[in-house]
Regions:
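Surface loop/turn motifs at the tips and blade-to-blade linkers of beta-strand repeat domains
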Residues: 7-10, 67-68, 113-116, 165-170
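Beta-propeller domains
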Residues: 29-54
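Conserved small/polar residues in nucleotide/adenosyl-binding loops
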Residues: 204-211
């Protein structure tokens, strides 16, 4: 299929995509703008249609006093057991939170706030249906990527927090996403602070039976 970049023209930074059957859904940062976090839909990853917004009420998105490039940072969209989840950071308000909806065409929930600092949160479900949160953070004075089990409906933290990566020598480890394939866990992060040394980094972790006990 022929395509022309940009496939979604305009202001759409920090995209996150999830697949549900034959459908793809994409969200992106909106910073100081309202409504927040648009949802795009595609069947071929080339032609995209705007479906709506995750954050379209002030009770979901408080931007009073927001500076330029404040507000909503780096959302992640996920789908699990019939429910969509969007997790993000409002750097102008209370920090990290997650909202959910059983349909991208419906209303999204009120925010479930998460007691964890940092930015760029994402969610990962393991094979046992446990949900894990990861984001940037500081633990025991060490800066890196923090992870723990979470209830994604309420934001309740269900396990001890663990520092799972300090990066691999680059500046500002951020943007973490955890994936699992063939019994192996993969952590993907960005480093370099979006400047000249910016780069993507991928880690291969221990096999499933060795790793779950560590989280």
């Amino acid at each position: 299929m022929l395509f022309k970049n940009p496939i979604i023209p305009g202001y759409n930074p920090d995209p996150s995509i999830c697949r549900v059957g034959d459908d793809f859904y994409l969200v992106n940062s909106t910073f100081e703008f309202f409504p927040g976090v648009p949802i795009y839909h595609s069947r071929n990853l080339v032609n995209w249609e705007l479906k709506g917004y995750c954050l379209d009420r002030r009770s979901q998105l408080e931007l009073e006093g927001c500076r330029n490039s404040g507000g909503i940072y780096a959302p992640t969209i996920r789908f699990h057991n019939g429910m969509f989840y969007m997790i993000t950071t409002n750097v102008t308000d209370k920090g990290n939170f997650v909202v959910h909806s059983d349909s991208v065409d419906g209303d999204w929930s009120e925010p479930a706030w998460i007691d964890q600092g940092g930015i760029d949160p994402s969610l990962f479900w393991d094979d046992d249906d446990k949900c894990y949160y990861c984001s940037t953070g500081i633990l025991d004075g060490v800066r890196g990527i923090v992870a723990f089990e979470i209830n994604p409906m309420t934001g309740e933290i269900l396990s001890d927090k663990k520092l799972i990566s300090e990066g691999c020598g680059g500046q500002c480890a951020e943007g973490p996403h955890i994936y699992k394939k063939d019994g192996m866990y993969y952590l993907m992060i960005a480093e370099g602070g979006t400047e000249y040394a910016h780069r993507a980094v991928s880690y291969t972790h221990l096999r499933a039976h060795e790793t779950r006990s560590n989280l």
